[in-house]
Amino acid sequence: VQGVAEFLPISSSGHLSLLQHFFGLEEIDALYNILLHFATLIAVFVVYWRDVADMVVEFFRMIGSLFIREEGRTRGNPPEARRMVLLLILGTLPLFLVLPFDDAVEGLGTNPVFVSAMLLVTGCILFLSDRYGGGRKTGRTATVKDVLLVGVAQGAATIPGLSRSGTTISAGMALGFERNFAVRFSFLLSLPAVLGATLLKVV
């Protein structure tokens, strides 16, 4: 279920919760949960490896430029990879607002009626964004406000039954993101989120 639902905007966590309830399965072991998150990271890395590689290189260049003055670099718009790194950092910030409520939100996953209702909400969000959303914004034209709002949508998607990818893609399209960029940004934005969640589980 995790493998099929993770890359579809249908809330893998919501479906896992319902699967546990209807089949009377015990709570997922913490180690197994960590492995599921790690597998998700690997899958995103495989699909977007070129983007990730460019951003990692640019991230270390950014760090290096704080200590070493770069000669020959002209002022102006930053490279696309550098801009994407900055957008992902900004988009991840709203997650810190929901951290204090993590246990309470996780408890909602044990209520099948609530989870089912959130799955319906996800469906409505996807329908509306597909019908009315979309624009021409890309990584070069997306604003700070845009990515922060997408980050807020990602924070809201910690609620069981709300699809993280579906919610962030829909938010991006509602803000005028071009469809392909909305999908790409959503999955790249999942990397720091899933990595952070995995580290929290380990700790």
Where are the regions that the model predicts?
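Multi-pass membrane proteins that catalyze or facilitate reactions on polyprenyl-/lipid-phosphate substrates
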Residues: 1-203
